[in-house]
Every structure is written in structure tokens, then in C-alpha cells.
Amino acid sequence: RCEKCNAPAEYLYLNDGKKANQVLCKICGHLGTTERVRRQSQAKYFCPHCSKPLSQWKTSSTETIYKCMSNDCPHYLKKKSALTPEEQVKRKQQKFDPNYKLHYQYREYHLKPEDLKCHRPACKTKVDLSKIHNSYHIVGLVLTFFVNAGLSSRLTRDLLKGIFGIKLSHQTVINYVNAAAAQIAPFLDCNLPKPGKIAAADETYLIVENEWHYTWFVIDSVTKAICGYNLSDTRGVAPALATLYNAYGTPDSNKGKQFTLVRDGCPSYDSAMMAYNHGLPEPVISGQKVIGLENLDEVSKEYRPHKQLVERLNRSYKFHTRPRAGMKSLNGASALTTLFVAYYNYLRVHSGMKHTPLKLEKLQGISSYPKQWETLLAISAA
């Protein structure tokens, strides 16, 4: 019978003459082999290249990796033949070197919905902006110096006193920033735009409590707006997948659509896209990899401009994080990142477009930075 449409044998005929290795179905046109591998194994998954059963190789809390162990697999032979002479010598010295990954692998993820939540500022803060003794204008001034100008809390305190005669402690500045971020975050998540056909993703470094952490961004290539963001302590699959969910929404909501994600060589993006597309009739997100600073292939040449967008976004983000010389808590880093995204999308005029990536009607005609923050806080609280 036909492997694809299950048509009886009388509808199959030899398609390669005397070799008698290939049959063609008259009903659906499917090409099959006369001696196909019968899947009598009780294995959970099979190799798509050689049809041999996949063996469970590694298991972690988030995923199980299955591996094709066959040395006759076409995928393995193709990867092996592509090795350079130097790589072949090194591999003979260490056959099980994990850097080559010649055998086909499949990952089964065990992620729960709570694992796919992006990190956001804590809802409970030390102050309630509706009950503070200072005016909202002072809060707007604090956010202008702290976010727009990228100054530290202590320098913000000093400038408020030296220029306007406003006496605040640096802790009060931090409290206002955290409270504003907690108030803006829900509004921001509800109004993040969905990426268009082409978007770029990247992760950048951030020091929190003297340890490396990572900020993830997804930016649309047309509007230049940030469509998704996240913070994590690893560059693993879970935060990458959570960022994709934050930007694109659930996979079921995108059935029948096609998106292209331009990213670097971080393997977490490949795994995250595979997990996102799992269970869908057709893949929703396909990736284009741009590595290094030079265009060494046609893909890099075509998609380099899109990758440059997220690189420039990271540079703008670093302008705001570098004066802090590291953050004392992940919640503080999340608060700063949330306010940066709000500033980048709604308040910062993009030099190439001569306007902000996203527009809010209530912000139109307001040129004063403190007043813009006051208005944005009022919109978020509504």
C-alpha cells in the first residue's frame, strides 16, 4: 500500500526501471521505496532521514533529547562529509566531542504555562503613586532624568536639587521608578504590537548582583517597535520561548501565518522556534541566521539590515544600563527595562523615521518629557 494515501498495491508501479527500488503512487503521486523500513519498534520517535528509532539520550527538567544512533543515517553521513580535514583529525582524537552534533536530534519539551511567563516588575511596591506627597510632575521629572537621560538614581537626586531645588533621597527616586514600572507594565503588555513578516531577535548582557543576566528583545523591521521583551538568568530555551510567546502570542492564534525571525547563532532560538511550531500543521516562525560582522553567505547579506536593527536597539539599551554599573536585584533590572521599552516605543523619536515607533493619541502634541510621562502613567492607571 501507498505510505501516504494507503492506496492498494495495484495503484503502485515501479518508477526507476530495472533497479526496482522506487515506486510511484498513481493516486497521490507519492514516491516511496520498495523495501521501506517497517516500524515495528515501540520507540516513541523515529528519525525522519533513515526511519530508525530515536534513543533517549539526555533528560532535564525542561526537555528530553532523543538521538538517532545509526551510523548509516543520510543526515549523519552528510554532516560527516562536510567536516574540514582539521575537524576530521580532531574528531578522531575525541570521537564523542559534543561540538559537532553529527547525529539527528529531536527535543521533547516539558514546559508548563508558568514557565513561559516573562519577567516583569513586582506588583507590590514600597510606594503607591496615588498616595505620594509630591506631585505627578516631580515623578515625571524623576523618570525624565532616570530613563530619558539614562542617569543613576543618585545623579537624578543631585540634578533635581541643583536645578529645581527639589529635595529627594536616592531611595525615593528608586521607589518612584519601581512604582511607575509596576503601573506601566500591564498596559505595555496589552499594547505590545505583533511583529510583521520580518522581525529580529537578540539577547544582551546585564549584570545583576555581580552575575550575568540576559535581556531578550524582539523588534519589528518595519515599525521599529519593540514587540516582546524578557529578562532571565540563563540563555536557555525557556526564556527564549517565553519571549516568542510575548511577541507573537500563542501558536494557535497564528495558524496559517508565516513569520521570519532574524537572529544570531544562539541555539536557544532554534529550539524555541521548534517548540513554538510543534503541533501546528505548518510552521509559523522560520528563522534566518546572521552570524558575525561580515556577510559570508547570501542569507547574511540579505538579512543583515534586519539584524542591525536589534543590534542598535541593544546599543540604546546599554546607554541606559551602563551608568548603573550593575543592578542590585532582578526586579530593579526589570523595572528599568520596562520603562525603557515604554520610552522606546512611545516617547523616543526614531531618528530615521522622525517619529516614535508607536503613537498614542493622548500623547500627540505634548513635547515636554515630564508631561509625557505623567500622561503615560495616567493612561496606564485608567
Regions found by a protein language model. Give the residues of each.
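Acidic/histidine-rich, metal-coordinating catalytic segments
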Residues: 255-270, 291, 359
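Active-site proximal helix-loop segment of RNase H-like, two-metal nucleases, encompassing DDE(D)
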Residues: 298-302, 306-329
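Active-site beta-loop-alpha junctions of metal-dependent nucleic acid enzymes
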Residues: 178-179, 229-254
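Short, positively charged, Gly/Tyr-enriched micro-motifs
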Residues: 4, 28-198, 203-209
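C-terminal domain-tail junction helix/linker
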Residues: 323-382
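Short, flexible loop/turn motifs enriched in small residues
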Residues: 208-214, 221, 225
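RNase H-like polynucleotidyl transferase catalytic core
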Residues: 280-308
